[in-house]
Amino acid sequence: MKKAIMGKKIGMTQIFNEAGKVIPVTVVEAGPCVVVQKKTVEKDGYEAIQVGFGDIREKLVNKPAKGHFEKAGVVLKRTLKEFRLEDVSQYEVGQEIKADVFEIGDKIDVSGVSKGKGFQGVIKRWNQQRGPMTHGSKFKRAPGSMGASSDPSRTFKNKRMPGHMGCVNTTVMNLEVVKVIAEKNLLLIKGGIPGPNKGTVVIRNAVKA
């Protein structure tokens, strides 16, 4: 069965397993999320649920969004996300989805917006090799050749060059849930996940597990 939830990245720490081995984990406050809309094949052509996460002040929400939440009879939420499922009959509008939908040992994919790094050169952005740092070298961290001269007289599209780095949607796949603290809606996930602390992340079943 497909499972999905939104959450807030708290930060990283470490725990010990039964053998005394250190496991680096990311703590995520997963939910509670609320079902705002339920879509069916008969009405919408596909099955999905629309889920809201995170509180927001009323003055920051526009009229169409307010009407959408009022129709569902739920409080205003900061983030809306739609999850496609095979069967939405087990969900109802207004129902809460909490961290206990996942269990210890579940394989998951975590998506989020990566940390922004600003304008970066080709060495940091694309892991290119630098030039010699001594003996009169005139290129140390420079990009090098961007293409031929008279033919084709242009730089090809998708040439790796300096530019804005980070702040893009990123997914880390096949992570493992090592602990679930249901009463606090916390998931402890083995390894690192995208984005800064307090950033919103989406947790789904692993598609390649």
Curated annotation (Swiss-Prot):
Which SUPFAM superfamilies does this chain map to? Translation proteins
PROSITE patterns cross-referenced by the UniProt entry: RIBOSOMAL_L3
GO MF, one annotated term? structural constituent of ribosome
Annotated region described as Disordered, given as residue ranges: 130-162
Q: What keywords were assigned to this record?
A: Ribonucleoprotein, Ribosomal protein, RNA-binding, rRNA-binding
Protein's recorded name: Large ribosomal subunit protein uL3
| GO terms classed as biological process | translation
Give the protein family.
Belongs to the universal ribosomal protein uL3 family.
| PANTHER family reported for this sequence | 50S RIBOSOMAL PROTEIN L3, LARGE RIBOSOMAL SUBUNIT PROTEIN UL3C
Query: What function does this protein fulfil?
Result: One of the primary rRNA binding proteins, it binds directly near the 3'-end of the 23S rRNA, where it nucleates assembly of the 50S subunit.
Give the record's subunit note.
Part of the 50S ribosomal subunit. Forms a cluster with proteins L14 and L19.
Q: Which InterPro entries match?
A: Ribosomal_uL3, Ribosomal_uL3_bac/org-type, Ribosomal_uL3_CS, Transl_B-barrel_sf
Q: Does the keyword Hydrolase apply?
A: no
Which Pfam families does UniProt cross-reference here?
Ribosomal_L3
Q: Write out the GO cellular component annotations.
A: cytosolic large ribosomal subunit
